[in-house]
Amino acid sequence: MTIPIVIEQSGRGERAFDIYSRLLRERIIFLGQQVDSNLANLIVAQLLFLDAEDPEKDIYLYINSPGGSVTAGMGIFDTMKHIRPDVCTICTGLAASMGAFLLSAGTKGKRMSLPHSRIMIHQPLGGAQGQATDIEIQAREILYHKRRLNDYLAEHTGQPIERIAEDTERDFFMSPDEARDYGLIDQVIDRHAAGSRPVAMVNQ
């Protein structure tokens, strides 16, 4: 995939940025593919950089992802909780599996979705092969991640853990309005003024 280049004019001449570097200057991070260790390292590095640059300003994490590695995603999640700025999450297109989990992990009141996105939660996927002992070890690990993710989803959404466990047994797709009612996000957004950031409406 060719990454677009942005040319900026200044008194010192022209400067060229790839589009993601230019967005990073505006404190925007784009998670736009399957979550793996390489992507997680990039997202974590950007979060830490923006935290060091200004701990008071919000970070905007746009998510369009089918999910991916649980351990890689948890690295992003832990960093979101570790840094000082609020992390506003915005779903554009699809937030499924770990993508939906990270969407729900944004700062309460600042978790959003564009109106035609889809959001899906389910239990962790995994496969094991080899000797019976190896399969048993992998099964225990999957059950561990399942419990942890369900606990956090219950915390993020306010839903009873029993409902989370039931709903994640199979792929559970939601519209943005349904995800808002479920507690995964706080607001469905359409457009915002030029030069501004999307801001969730928080009930007082």
UniProtKB/Swiss-Prot annotation:
GO terms for cellular component: cytoplasm; endopeptidase Clp complex. The gene is clpP1. InterPro entries: ClpP (IPR001907), ClpP/crotonase-like_dom_sf (IPR029045), ClpP/TepA (IPR023562), ClpP_His_AS (IPR033135). Belongs to the peptidase S14 family. It comes from Trichormus variabilis (strain ATCC 29413 / PCC 7937) (Anabaena variabilis). GO terms for biological process: protein quality control for misfolded or incompletely synthesized proteins. PANTHER family: ATP-DEPENDENT CLP PROTEASE PROTEOLYTIC SUBUNIT. Keywords: Cytoplasm, Hydrolase, Protease, Serine protease. PROSITE patterns: CLP_PROTEASE_HIS. This is ATP-dependent Clp protease proteolytic subunit 1. The active site is at S97 (nucleophile), H122. One of its GO terms (molecular function) is ATPase binding. It is found in: Cytoplasm. SUPFAM superfamilies: ClpP/crotonase. Fourteen ClpP subunits assemble into 2 heptameric rings which stack back to back to give a disk-like structure with a central cavity, resembling the structure of eukaryotic proteasomes. It catalyses: Hydrolysis of proteins to small peptides in the presence of ATP and magnesium. alpha-casein is the usual test substrate. In the absence of ATP, only oligopeptides shorter than five residues are hydrolyzed (such as succinyl-Leu-Tyr-|-NHMec, and Leu-Tyr-Leu-|-Tyr-Trp, in which cleavage of the -Tyr-|-Leu- and -Tyr-|-Trp bonds also occurs).
